Structure formats: C-alpha cells, structure tokens
Amino acid sequence: MTDAPDHHATEKRLITETGVAARVAQIVEPSLEGLGFRLVRVRVTGQNGCTVQIMAERPDGTMTVEDCEAVSRTISPLLDVDDPIGRAYHLEISSPGIDRPLVRAGDFARWAGHEAKVELAVPLEGRKRFRGLIRAPEGATVRIDLPDAKEGTPASYELRLADIGEAHLVLTDDLIRESLRRGSAPAQDEEGEDEAPGAPL
C-alpha cells in the first residue's frame, strides 16, 4: 500500500455543512488555507452549553498540537467579530483523528485499501449505508468492496462521489499502524472559551 500524492490545500470538499456550521466554515476556511491548512469539518453541538468543533489538517494529513494552537489564535478573533453563533460557545480545534472523516476525493485515494463506513445522501439500489474496503476514486465514482456481503448480493459497489453524505474510516489495527507510520496520529485538541460580543464575563 503506497501513499497517494499530496493534494493542494484548496481541493474542494465533497461533504459540507449546513446552517450555522456552514457559516462558521465560510468564515474560517480562507484563513485556514492562508496558514497552509485545510478544513475537514465543522460541527456545532449543544455540548458544554455550545461547542464549536473545527477539524483541520495540513495537506499531508498531519496536525500537531502547535498547529492547533496556531489555528485557534487565528480564527478565534474572526469568529468573535462575525459572531455566527450569537451566544457564548466553547471552541475546539482538533486533528481529524485516526478514524477520520473522508470529505475529499483525495482522502479516499490516500486511504485506499482501508475499511470505511459510507452513507449516501441518495440511495443506491435501495440502500444508503455501506461498510467495506474503499478503493481509489476513478473519475466521479469510488468503489467499495464488501468482504461480508451475503451470498447472492453484490460484493462491491461503485458509489458516486457527489452522492456521498458522510464517510469515515473504521478504526482497525492496520489503520492504526499506517497512521503512525505516516505521522498522522491525532494531535491533542486545542480548546478555548469564547463569549459572544456583549455577553457578560
């Protein structure tokens, strides 16, 4: 298994956010790219009152603690000025982790041969959820092989990249070894408390 070529930080994501998370992504993504990082995912949850989780990485898939700190220092003031949350929130900056989301075609290429869970936004032959070994994309599709397919059912599917709603790697011993070899094991999260403008201290 060989590493896929590095992709430019501006490779477009296949899977993007909606609502408030989409607004956060719109604010922070240009600055992340300016620092040499690329956005993986934004999530806004009700954890700890309100938590904004921003997942980022370098184009080679690495993300150190120092990288998380640099990202936090840069984007925290941007979020304070634009105030997309509208209330006090807890900011978390993290690496994608070993069982990372797959949000770009390059992610599927980089981790070809590893196990992943994929959920389609549009059903294929009556099903939306797949778990199996992903292959490198070919054009607009990516193949997923299903080792545990029942007799009489397809052992693989060609999934349209544009139809993927969510995808992430499955944590396995092989994946852990490969992540450590590549130096893409997760960095410690950088966390901070942020108040919406005008909120009491």
Curated annotation (Swiss-Prot):
GO biological process: ribosomal small subunit assembly; translation
Keywords: Cytoplasm, Ribosome biogenesis
Major location (coarse): cytoplasm
Biased composition (Acidic residues): 188-201
Gene Ontology cellular-component terms listed: cytosol
Cytoplasm as UniProt keyword: yes
Functional note: Required for maturation of 30S ribosomal subunits.
Family: Belongs to the RimP family.
NCBIfam families with a match to the protein in the record: PRK00092.2-5 (NF000932)
Protein name: Ribosome maturation factor RimP
Organism: Methylobacterium sp. (strain 4-46)
Gene name of the encoded protein: rimP
